[in-house]
Regions:
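C-terminal end segment of the histidine kinase catalytic
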Residues: 165-169
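Two-component histidine phosphotransfer core
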Residues: 1-18, 22-154, 158-160
Length: 169
C-alpha cells in the first residue's frame, strides 16, 4: 500500500507527495495532547492545516521565505511527534535571499534527512538550515548535540534554476 496522498497538485511532477503516515502520526500526537495540553493540541492541528494548505494547493511559485516558514511548520509538527528529539535552527526571513521555489522544494529533502536521521539515531537531533546568499541552494546540517562522537551529516538542497529566476520553465 502506498502511504502517500495521491492527486497532489504540483508544478513539478517529480516533487514529493505528502506522506499519509506523517499526517496520521501528527494527528495521533495532537490527540495525545487534547486532555493534558489542549492549547498545544490546537497549535499542532493549526500547524497541520497550514502545512497541508501550503503543499496541496495548485502549482505555483512561492518566495523562499514562505517555503522556510513551511519548513518551520514542518519542524514544529515533528517536534510534536517526537517530543524532545528535534532542535531546529532556521534562518530568519531577513537573512534569506530573494529567491523563489516550488512548495515543498526545500521541506521535502529536509523531511527525508530528518526522518532518516531519527530512524538511525536514538538521541536528539539538531537541524541547522542555512541559505547561500545567491539563493541557489541551502544546506541542512544534522548532528547529535549530546554526542559529539556521532558524525554529522550535510544535505545540500539545490533550488530549481527556473524558480530562482522567478518562473517555471
Amino acid at each position: 500500500m502506498d502511504d502517500r496522498i495521491e492527486g497532489q497538485a504540483s508544478a513539478d511532477p517529480g516533487s514529493a507527495p505528502v506522506s499519509v503516515h506523517f499526517v496520521n502520526n501528527v494527528l495521533a500526537a495532537a490527540a495525545s495532547l487534547i486532555d493534558v495540553e489542549p492549547d498545544s493540541a490546537r497549535d499542532v492541528l493549526a500547524d497541520l492545516g497550514a502545512f497541508l494548505s501550503h503543499r496541496l494547493r495548485p502549482a505555483r511559485i512561492v518566495p523562499l521565505d514562505q517555503e522556510l516558514e513551511h519548513v518551520a511548520t514542518y519542524t514544529r509538527l515533528e517536534q510534536a511527534r517526537f517530543p524532545g528529539r528535534l532542535q531546529a535552527e532556521l534562518p530568519s526571513s531577513r537573512d534569506l535571499p530573494s529567491a523563489q521555489c516550488t512548495p515543498g522544494e526545500v521541506q521535502a529533502p529536509v523531511a527525508d534527512a530528518v526522518n532518516r536521521w531519527l530512524g538511525e539515531h536514538p538521541g536528539r537531533l539538531r537541524l541547522a538550515l542555512r541559505a547561500r546568499l545567491d539563493g541557489s541552494s541551502l544546506e541542512a546540517q544534522l548532528d547529535e548535540p549530546d554526542d559529539p562522537s556521532v558524525a554529522g551529516e550535510r544535505v545540500r538542497i539545490v533550488l530549481t534554476p527556473a524558480t530562482i529566476a522567478g518562473g517555471l520553465a
